[in-house]
Amino acid sequence: MSLVGIRPAKLEDRSLIRSISERTWPSTYGHIISKEQIDFMLDWMYSDESLAGQFEKGHQFFIAQLNGNDIGFCSVSKSDEGQGDHKLNKLYILPNIQKSGAGTALLFKAIEIAKAAGSTSLFLQVNKHNNAYEFYLKKGFIKESEFKFDIGNGYYMDDYVMRLSF
């Protein structure tokens, strides 16, 4: 069995982060939202400019590696609401590598970052129909609320807000 490695991402990793997103989103969201909405959201969240802005705002990205291959990433940041918590903004693993322990390793890294900063919880948003919802429940997250967020062009994010307290 191979161990999953985690490394900090750099600004120069934007194309890698975009590439992993482009390979994970169709299988993650293709049964939930249209291809047009997937394309819109990928451009909105994973363009070079958008990712550069996220790095600039203090989002910390980490890359998961297995056998020397980059297989996923996560992003964690201090909460914008100033509630003394952190937000897991993104966590994606290539479809053929899921259930390898990489998602858990990235989640543990995000928790480590939040705890080291003095936060008492980690929260996230997950689409109501995303299989990752069950993953987060198994890891101890609690569904806190749900909301439908207008992201423009007639598209919505229909999410649960989940929180892990520590």
Name what the model sees in each region.
Residues 8-14, 18-97, 107-109, 113, ...:
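Acetyl-CoA-dependent GNAT
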